[in-house]
């Protein structure tokens, strides 16, 4: 294939963040000195930005912000630590370690994220190094859990369900390792590794990223049809596993250019769906990923960060240009994409027996928050299970948890423990609640404009009787809520979704595809709870009485004319 046209990288002066990365000496900056400063519980802005690459965000508890300001105190600074777990897999020993850190340094809970990672909230600055050291001692890491690099690689979390799942999990590990930053700064700062005075003296420190890394974060996910639980079309780079005639992994369809984030009021920003561009064999997976990443490295927008994601690079230059550039770098052509079929994006709850004879239990975890409450001792139950479990824990892309690779003997014991602590598999919750996703939002996320995790359950409380009255209590409807438009809970792929606009107010969207292949469309702007209920009630009632057999909610609201179908993000605001 010949090149259609030559494209130059985006012009304009590099942003302040680009200068920061360049001058950071491969992510060192002055982090060591700032961490040692006992005068403040926070970090200077420049080091705070660098800290993301090391897997942490500085936050403050916004519930206390006004009161502390009145008392002339600095904000209640604390840090969120995100732990990289490729494919969401953790051993029982690693689970117990994270559980203990939640009490030792955190706020007494664990957050399971929509990208299959752990988050630990409330860590104080003076405890950061100790926490990271304990995490690494358990063969986990926070490096590249955040920052302008390839993040935690997602995949279907049930590798013991079949040989195919096991192979796919292997590639999530390989991709995470291959694309991880190679700078020794992480080991120097956190693990007391041997210090290198000047990273440049080592030669090529970052052979893939270079000294300024990527223009923005880069997300990779691997889906295993018929489940699109990882929302593969939301990824910068997606792999769709294809089964061969021999029942083994033949390779992957590849899709590029997805992403959920946008900025309120700026129609030049939008969520986007990744496009399928071809098929690769397993031995081509790493080469393809590296070349795709380097295209974004070289052509992504480094002047304006809100336009810097890979989706804008592709949309700006065009898919034909991207394919030419990719082939030039690869030196070989992708094969034509193969047939596949997705049926759902949600989790399948309860016990499932794998082909190897072992069991997997998918547990519902509301908003991914593992915590003990007065009426739900989930954290205690999982702690006791981890003490006897000989398989794995697998975090799902829907913020739930799979207790995987369970023997028949251990299954009996785990069932007894769940009963002892009163934990249900998920069948006692409504289909709507089981299909809900939300980000953390307030009080710790500095970007949140409204509540999400703390509020969505109560909104569902009001929606459940409406659905029950319509006979839809068992109908899966993907509902998602975020406190801002950055898209952490992938709201643009919710059949019903809410994006925070201001305290108590949300933009309401509808019409995304049930299998994650169509974006939602804004239906109402800046509305509160009562208007949400008043708006959805007649739509739900009409859906119950007028839907076609097997018709999902997102498809119905388009057919009924409530919103238009959005299959490309460039039409999201039309």
UniProtKB/Swiss-Prot annotation:
Gene Ontology CC terms, in alphabetical order: sulfite reductase complex (NADPH)
Q: Which reaction does it catalyse?
A: hydrogen sulfide + 3 NADP(+) + 3 H2O = sulfite + 3 NADPH + 4 H(+)
Q: What class of enzyme is it?
A: oxidoreductase
Q: Which UniProt keywords apply?
A: 4Fe-4S, Amino-acid biosynthesis, Cysteine biosynthesis, Heme, Iron, Iron-sulfur, Metal-binding, NADP, Oxidoreductase
Name of the protein = Sulfite reductase [NADPH] hemoprotein beta-component
Pathway membership of this protein? Sulfur metabolism; hydrogen sulfide biosynthesis; hydrogen sulfide from sulfite (NADPH route): step 1/1
State the Gene Ontology terms under molecular function: 4 iron, 4 sulfur cluster binding; heme binding; metal ion binding; NADP binding; sulfite reductase (ferredoxin) activity; sulfite reductase (NADPH) activity
Q: Which residues bind [4Fe-4S] cluster?
A: 439, 445, 484, 488
